[in-house]
Amino acid sequence: VRGTQFLLEAISSARLSTRVLIPGSALVYQPSTDAIAEDHPIGPVSPYGLSKLAQEMLGKKCADSELAILFPRSFTHLGPGQNPSYAVSSFASQIAKIETNETPPVIRVGSLEALRDLTDVRDTVDAYRALMARGVSGRPYNVCSGHAHRMSDVLEALLSQTDVDVAVHIDQKRLRPKDNDLLLGDPSRINAEIGWYAKTELEETLRDTLNYWRDVVRL
């Protein structure tokens, strides 16, 4: 948050005519059992969500004055190169290590019942580019696919791409006490106003993510 503050203050002091994009998160919203649009009530329930909301508030203060600030609110994005602290990248990295006998054939997971709106990170970056070019300053935009996937199905899809037999173990340490059961976005605004749509099929994203980790493990 302080880094965002210092950056915006520096840009303002230098009187630069520039557009600034502050990557936000769907975790600024209150939990919902339906698809979330940008007018859904704000109410983060995690420290991370609070920090992203604080960044937005700093940015909006500047957007109300002289700077052009863009506010994407990304739902779950994934893809090759993502840190294995995230669920799908963790699944893929564990499978890759099992394939090379680096670890026993057991995948440790958190909740597999959660439903998540998943967007390929490459589509997410394309959304950021489009917003920098055509987005309205101070206006939030959901970056999402509009489709929810159960994490158990995502894991099953990854396992279908390997020949190894794997056991799945629920690791209590990976369960998050304040995790939302459903996190689904409504992309209508960014679709209509910016012309951006999530294009990459989940199967392609999962394949590329698993192949990325196969390459990493073999190094």
What are these regions (language model features)?
Residues 1-6, 12, 18-19, 27-71, ...:
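Catalytic helix-loop patch of NAD(P)-dependent Rossmann-fold dehydrogenases
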Residues 2, 46, 82, 86, ...:
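Residue-level signal for the nucleotide or nucleotide-sugar donor/cofactor binding architecture
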Residues 21-25, 45, 73-75, 110-113, ...:
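Active-site beta-alpha turn of Rossmann-fold NAD(P)-dependent dehydrogenases/reductases
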Residues 91, 134-175:
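Mid/C-terminal beta-alpha module of Rossmann-like enzyme folds, strongest
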Residues 102-107, 128-143, 166-168, 217-219:
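Core catalytic loop region at the nicotinamide-binding pocket of NAD(P)H-dependent oxidoreductases
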Residues 202-219:
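Amphipathic terminal alpha-helices
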Residues 34-35, 57-116, 121-130, 148, ...:
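NAD(P)-dependent short-chain dehydrogenase/reductase
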Residues 121, 140, 153, 172-201, ...:
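Conserved C-terminal active-site "lid" loop/helix of NAD(P)H-dependent oxidoreductases
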